[in-house]
Every structure is written in structure tokens, then in C-alpha cells.
């Protein structure tokens, strides 16, 4: 197993997160999302500017997983909730958690979730939300194993002109 290091991302990591975010999004969804729309989506929502804004926001936090040679292979984002269901003040959202395929199933996703949950608890959050693509059964199984449950609420996720359904899940941290 390749040794990896998990650390808190800093503003200087925006370009690394941008590349990693784009790569993992394309890898995860290229099988059922239109190509041109995916490229445009990555250019907008995985741009260096997008990550610079996120990393500059004190309400947000990010973690990056790297090899010994500092190559980024995974990341997670914690943000205020932007979900289409009722939330309480102080609740937070696990906005993104992705690993490059060769680094999945080695316990690193668990380490990323543990880092996010520890920070959410330190901030006093009682609930941690996330959105998961309704067709992503593997992610749903992973989240269920780690205490998240489907709220029954849905929201649409657009890539270009195509809408996809996300399920809103929550974990009680109290």
C-alpha cells in the first residue's frame, strides 16, 4: 500500500484541488453525463477560482490526501449546508469527498469522513448533511456504513441541460 498523508488544505492548494476535483468528477460521472457539459461543469465548479473562494471562506474547510511525493489523490470539503431541505443553524454539509480510483477501498475515505466529522463537531454542528447522486449505489452504501441516512428529500443537480437527482442524507452528530 502506498503511504498517504491527510492534511488540512490551505489557500495555496487551490490549483491542486482544482485538478483533483476535475479528475475525480470526470472519472466518477463520465459514463452517464454528456461530455461537453461535463467539461463546462468542471471548468466552472472545479476552477482554481472556485477553490480559492472556498479556501478563503472561514465557514468552509477542506482536506487533501497526498502521496509521499505530494501528489494529490483525494479530498473532502465541509461547507454551510446548501441542501433543499430544512436545516438548523450550525448544521454543516459534507460538500465533496472524492478519491482517485487506485486509492479507494483502502480506508482513506473513512479518514476523510472522520476529519470532516471532527471539524463539524468542533464547530458545534449537530447534523452533517450531504447530497449523493441517486444512481451512485456504491457511495450510498459507503455513507450508510458511516451513519448517514436518507432524509427522503431530493434535489436536482444540473450538468449542462441535463438534470440528475441527488438524494439528501444526514448524520446526527449530537
Residue ranges and their predicted role:
Residues 4, 8-14, 18-32, 37-102, ...:
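Acetyl-CoA-dependent GNAT
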Residues 1:
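Short, conserved catalytic or adaptor-binding loops enriched in Gly and charged residues
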Amino acid at each position: 500500500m502506498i503511504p498517504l498523508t491527510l492534511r488540512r488544505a490551505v489557500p495555496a492548494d487551490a490549483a491542486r484541488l482544482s485538478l483533483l476535483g476535475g479528475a475525480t468528477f470526470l472519472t466518477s460521472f463520465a459514463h452517464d453525463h454528456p461530455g461537453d457539459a461535463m467539461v463546462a461543469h468542471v471548468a466552472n465548479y472545479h476552477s482554481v477560482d472556485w477553490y480559492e473562494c472556498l479556501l478563503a471562506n472561514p465557514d468552509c474547510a477542506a482536506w487533501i490526501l497526498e502521496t509521499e511525493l505530494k501528489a494529490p489523490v483525494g479530498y473532502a470539503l465541509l461547507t454551510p449546508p446548501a441542501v433543499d431541505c430544512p436545516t438548523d443553524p450550525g448544521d454543516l454539509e459534507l460538500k465533496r469527498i472524492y478519491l482517485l480510483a487506485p486509492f479507494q477501498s483502502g480506508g482513506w475515505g473513512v479518514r476523510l469522513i472522520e476529519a470532516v466529522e471532527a471539524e463539524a463537531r468542533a464547530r458545534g454542528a449537530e447534523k452533517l448533511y450531504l447530497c449523493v447522486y441517486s444512481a451512485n449505489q456504491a457511495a450510498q452504501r459507503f455513507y450508510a456504513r458511516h451513519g448517514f441516512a436518507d432524509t427522503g428529500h431530493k434535489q436536482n443537480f444540473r450538468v449542462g441541460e441535463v438534470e440528475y437527482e441527488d438524494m439528501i442524507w444526514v448524520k446526527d452528530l449530537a
